[in-house]
Amino acid sequence: MPVRRIGIGVAADGARVQESARKAGIDSRVIFYAKPGLLDAGQDFGIEEGDEPWKMLVGDLYAGKIDAAVRGTLPSGATLRVLREAAGVDHLERAALLEDGKGRRFLLAPVGIDEGWTVVDRVAIARRTKDLAGILGLEGGVAILSGGRLSDAGRHPRVDESLAQAELVARLTGFPHFEILIEDAAEECSVIIAPDGISGNLVFRTLALLGCGQGHGAPVLNIDRIFIDTSRASPSYANAIRL
């Protein structure tokens, strides 16, 4: 299905969001969802205003008025809560499309701090992220990470637990366990599954916000609409709009 209309949320720094839409350079029409008086969209873009723009953005996505949505600078808690309710799911699973300093692109999951805390969660996330990689044309396998090398067993109970869980995820999915060696995983794979959501979030922030890499947004995996989550700390949302 062609994506003709893309909505993006604006709660702060409207100029940055507008500039991102201009830099995206896409044929799709971009529509801003913001509180009244926050910005002037001009002739190039549409604008929908309301006191709760996150509800409008998600509502229009599920009503078919827009074909895809980007969170932009809308608050995470309120926006994702409304999205969960509209999608009829009790949790969301996200995978971030990242690019390192060498220009290599890969998907990283889980990246939400409340995601990926059980073996069942990570098995589901790994399989869905692999499917997304295929849609995006990313070649390479799936790497399961843990909190140490197998030879580190016995050094700390949490390390032991992380190793055991990663081994189980690897066995259930058939994907290789790369232990803690994320550098090797990035060389060989297009999908990296972190030990938990906090680890994944830290990897994302280190690469995209401190290092030489960049983020392209984080599609939500377990809903039937296109919704790209973003970090409010991102310098631009052009990549997420293109995605």
What is the predicted role of each segment?
Residues 1-185, 189-190, 199-243:
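Anion-binding alpha/beta catalytic cores of soluble intermediary-metabolism enzymes, centered on
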